[in-house]
Amino acid sequence: MEEVVAERSNLGGVRHILLVLSGKGGVGKSTISTELALSLRHSGKKVGILDVDLCGPSIPRMFKVQDNDVHQCDAGWVPVFVDQEKSISLMSIGFLLEKPDDAVVWRGPKKNALIKQFVADVAWGELDFLIVDTPPGTSDEHISTVEALRPYKPLGAILVTTPQAVSVGDVRRELTFCKKTGLRVLGIVENMSGFVCPHCSECTNIFSKGGGEELAKHAGVPFLGSVPLDPQLSQSLEEGRDFIQEFPKSSAFPALTRIAQQILDGALQRSS
């Protein structure tokens, strides 16, 4: 019965769904979601992003589409296309707020209802990947998201951390959450992993080193890679530019493209 419902829904044309999780805020989860979408697009894939970080919807600004409006069609909400080729589509509560600075001051049941509505009522059309950018932590919103997506058999989750022990500790709780909810862990990404000097290419570990990789080994899950601090990446996000296209020689580019390739490989293995 679940499979019949999934085929007839707005997610029926989506081949692979993956969630991006983090144990705490400020680790760059939305940055990884954004750059993963761009990397997959440059691999020839059609990508959707569902931003369910209801209290901190930052992805519309990262694509410089924060002033766009969401329209209705017979099938539901039409997502916002972030590029002329319409290869990346985005849905976020940021498009539904009257003012950009409005705060979402809602209790759990109202948030959970909107998440379920996002899953059911966005007309995505045909997509190769749908990336679901979640709030930090483990809460009712995460449970609602996983339960709403379960009929569509998500590919799995990417966990984002930074090298510090406090962030790595929070990701351990995310691993437990994934285990309890039956969500497959595709791997761990360590973000802000050192700063590579643009002049001499020497890497300085500003925080600490290797926490994400060590956790992945301990938990028995793949380590997808370390993404260094990169001023060009920050600049591209501030200006809504395509980092993957414009900065192929930057220090973060190889790590981000390797992460995307591993996701593509995992999706191919699942399909075969």
Curated annotation (Swiss-Prot):
PROSITE patterns: MRP. It is found in: Cytoplasm. One of its GO terms (molecular function) is metal ion binding. Heterotetramer of 2 NUBP1 and 2 NUBP2 chains. It holds the Pfam family ParA. GO terms for biological process: iron-sulfur cluster assembly. Component of the cytosolic iron-sulfur (Fe/S) protein assembly (CIA) machinery. Required for maturation of extramitochondrial Fe-S proteins. The NUBP1-NUBP2 heterotetramer forms a Fe-S scaffold complex, mediating the de novo assembly of an Fe-S cluster and its transfer to target apoproteins. Its main location: cytoplasm. PANTHER family: CYTOSOLIC FE-S CLUSTER ASSEMBLY FACTOR NUBP2 (PTHR23264:SF19), NUCLEOTIDE-BINDING PROTEIN NBP35 YEAST -RELATED (PTHR23264). ATP binds at G23, K24, G25, G26, V27, G28, K29, S30. Binds 4 [4Fe-4S] clusters per heterotetramer. Contains two stable clusters in the N-termini of NUBP1 and two labile, bridging clusters between subunits of the NUBP1-NUBP2 heterotetramer. CDD domains: Mrp_NBP35. This is Cytosolic Fe-S cluster assembly factor NUBP2. Its cofactor is [4Fe-4S] cluster. Keywords: 4Fe-4S, ATP-binding, Cytoplasm, Iron, Iron-sulfur, Metal-binding, Nucleotide-binding. Belongs to the Mrp/NBP35 ATP-binding proteins family. NUBP2/CFD1 subfamily. [4Fe-4S] cluster binds at C197, C200. GO terms for cellular component: cytosol; nucleoplasm; spindle pole centrosome.
